[in-house]
Amino acid sequence: PIKPHWHYFMEIIYIFEGHAEVRSGSTVISAGRGDMALFHPKAVHSIFSDSPDDLRYGVIKLDINCINMTAENAPKFRSIFSFAEQRGMSIYFDNAQTEAIEASRIFENCIKEMQVRRYGYNDIIRSDISCLLVGVLRLWQESKFTIDSEVFADDGVYDIYNITEYIEEN
């Protein structure tokens, strides 16, 4: 079991085998094979096996501040995901949704790249994580989530916020 904790990073888990009770804040999810959950930065979350079967899942923990789209005119991932959190977008994605965004392949490839660590592995992992994040955004868009001017307005706010957070930590 992973007891309740939080950190400054985003975390995404993908269930490969078994069944788990996944909690984030007041949200409780019963997740099985092929399901995925996203924990926003600073969200208190936990994971407990809720079946006698072995639980096996992959974890991607990332600093959302360090992954951005390349287009200058695109809002930063951190602003989009913060906006989605404020709008209460689902942090749970079922097997059909994860198949649509190829989450299993992405997780397996990231794990393989981390194990082998051949030249450029970090670039491949960053690319795969970007694909996963865009996939999540597209799933949210199917649920009427829109990326509008409010998201762009937050880009500068988070720059100042991150600087003050860094100063506070040090």
Please give the residue ranges for each predicted region.
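Residues immediately flanking
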Residues: 17, 41, 62-64
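Generic protein-terminus/edge-of-domain signal
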Residues: 1-36, 43, 51, 74-79, ...
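Short intrinsically disordered, low-complexity coil segments enriched in acidic
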Residues: 1-6, 14, 38, 59, ...
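A hydrophobic/aromatic-rich effector-binding and dimerization subdomain
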Residues: 48-112, 138-143
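Short, Lys/Arg-enriched, Trp-marked, Pro/Gly-tolerant hinge/linker segments that flank
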Residues: 91-99, 114-127, 133-170
